[in-house]
């Protein structure tokens, strides 16, 4: 039986707009097990990104609990560094560092072995079709290539959970499929869970579970 890696329990997120209370998330629950591929769809403004931010300990819910069972870390910044991987549609690469250096940066911040980090990063970048561009600067890469570097960076610390917000939005269908295959590989080989927000319904239906976020709640789609 797979171990649970994330529990969102009775999560609510409310905002005030004048005298009106906007309920973005409303008593939402989600349990994520290791190795699961989860897709979340929903209309623009439905709260998908807010949900990812709360799950990733980047935002606090108005009510409810984010539980990460069996984590040996208590401080949020350490959980984010060692336990979680983040991918956004905007890649936020460091422009003065090569593709390879961008990918190994989280591993070096963690104080882990540089040689092993380079070997792992080279393998991931090669799996994403960037084996010949390890030493290119971000400005020398296309938008899709830059996004693949960002995806590789999210994987370098072998996180328990990857939180991906429209990770393939700027990618062509072939590269989108390569990204899915990489997610599938880390899920099956490393038991990494992936929670992905996407508007790509074809990609969403390839995942193990598909949820739709509507009126602040998640429902099986």
From Swiss-Prot:
Membrane topology: Peripheral membrane protein
Oligomeric form and interacting partners: The complex is composed of two ATP-binding proteins (LolD) and two transmembrane proteins (LolC and LolE).
Main location (coarse class): membrane
EC numbers for this chain: 7.6.2.-
The organism of origin for this protein: Rickettsia felis (strain ATCC VR-1525 / URRWXCal2) (Rickettsia azadi)
GO molecular function per UniProt: ATP binding; ATP hydrolysis activity
Paired cysteines (S-S): none
Keyword Ribosomal protein: no
This protein's encoding gene: lolD
Pfam family, one: ABC_tran
Sorted UniProt keywords: ATP-binding, Cell inner membrane, Cell membrane, Membrane, Nucleotide-binding, Translocase, Transport
Chain sites annotated for binding ATP: 42-49
UniProt similarity note: Belongs to the ABC transporter superfamily. Lipoprotein translocase (TC 3.A.1.125) family.
Name of the protein described by the UniProt record: Lipoprotein-releasing system ATP-binding protein LolD
Compartments, as annotated in UniProt: Cell inner membrane
Enzyme class: translocase
Lineage of the species this protein comes from: Bacteria, Pseudomonadati, Pseudomonadota, Alphaproteobacteria, Rickettsiales
GO cellular component terms attached to this protein's record: plasma membrane
Domain (ABC transporter) ranges: 6-220
Function recorded in the entry: Part of the ABC transporter complex LolCDE involved in the translocation of mature outer membrane-directed lipoproteins, from the inner membrane to the periplasmic chaperone, LolA. Responsible for the formation of the LolA-lipoprotein complex in an ATP-dependent manner.
């Amino acid at each position: 039986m797979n171990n649970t890696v994330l529990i969102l329990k009775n999560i609510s997120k409310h905002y005030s707009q004048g005298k009106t209370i906007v309920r973005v998330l409303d008593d939402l629950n989600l349990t994520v097990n290791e190795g699961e591929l989860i897709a979340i769809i929903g209309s623009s403004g439905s709260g998908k990104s807010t949900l990812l931010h709360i799950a990733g300990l980047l935002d606090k819910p108005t009510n409810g609990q984010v539980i990460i069972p069996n984590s040996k870390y208590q401080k949020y910044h350490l959980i984010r560094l060692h336990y979680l991987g983040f991918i956004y549609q905007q890649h936020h690469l460091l422009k003065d560092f090569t593709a390879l250096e961008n990918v190994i940066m989280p591993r070096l911040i963690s104080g882990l072995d540089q040689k092993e980090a380079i070997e792992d990063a080279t393998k991931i970048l090669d799996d994403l079709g960037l084996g010949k561009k390890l030493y290119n600067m971000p400005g020398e890469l296309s938008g899709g290539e830059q996004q693949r570097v960002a995806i590789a960076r999210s994987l370098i610390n072998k996180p328990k959970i990857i939180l991906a917000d429209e990770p393939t939005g700027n990618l062509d269908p072939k590269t989108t499929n390569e990204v899915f295959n990489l997610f599938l590989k880390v899920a099956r080989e490393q038991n990494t869970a992936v929670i992905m927000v996407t508007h790509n319904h074809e990609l969403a239906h390839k995942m193990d579970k598909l949820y739709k976020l509507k009126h602040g709640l998640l429902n099986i789609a």
